[in-house]
Amino acid sequence: MLTIDIQQASTADASQLPSDKQFEIWVEAALQQRMNEAELSIRIVDEDESQALNLQYRGKDKSTNVLSFPCELPDGVELPLLGDLVICAQVVAKEALEQGKLLHAHWAHMVVHGTLHLLGYDHIEDGEAEEMEAIEIQVLLELGYPNPY
């Protein structure tokens, strides 16, 4: 079972944001065959909150598209808590425009990308990046979206 707590903390036009159901579809697709039960939060924020979190946790003083905060449970505690995603609506919209992507498709990519980070995937090393990108491409193609790269 999938439980998603969606927090809308952005001033972005709600008509430009995905529906709760769409977030659920994208997360389920990323989790497919990787995790059967999960709880996570998705917080939609403005650039100021994204920038503050990016500075605090990554040392980068700029807003970013998605931040992933995996849940770190103590040993012996077995709960399906995956973690939190913080997605900046303005950055996602700006990137979609700059990259010539449909806004909906870029949102899907950011949710899948962030969810894979929560599962432990990363793109720091070339080999890890190739693996993660291949999974993203496959998941997005299965959802009917084009290759985001």
Curated annotation (Swiss-Prot):
Cellular component per GO?
Answer: cytoplasm
| Cofactor requirements of the protein | Zn(2+)
Annotated binding of Zn(2+), by residue: H113, H117, H123
Q: Which InterPro entries match?
A: MetalPrtase_cat_dom_sf_prd, YbeY, YbeY_CS
What Pfam families does the database record attribute to this sequence?
Answer: YbeY
Q: Which UniProt keywords apply?
A: Cytoplasm, Endonuclease, Hydrolase, Metal-binding, Nuclease, Ribosome biogenesis, rRNA processing, Zinc
GO biological process, alphabetically ordered: rRNA processing
Q: Give the domain of life.
A: Bacteria
Give the enzyme's EC designation.
Answer: 3.1.-.-
**A GO MF term:** metalloendopeptidase activity
Answer whether the UniProt record assigns the keyword Lipid biosynthesis to this protein.
Answer: no
Q: Where can this protein be found?
A: Cytoplasm
What function does this protein fulfil?
Single strand-specific metallo-endoribonuclease involved in late-stage 70S ribosome quality control and in maturation of the 3' terminus of the 16S rRNA.
Recorded protein name is Endoribonuclease YbeY
Q: What organism is the protein native to?
A: Saccharophagus degradans (strain 2-40 / ATCC 43961 / DSM 17024)
Could you read off the lineage of the organism from its UniProt record?
A: Bacteria, Pseudomonadati, Pseudomonadota, Gammaproteobacteria, Cellvibrionales
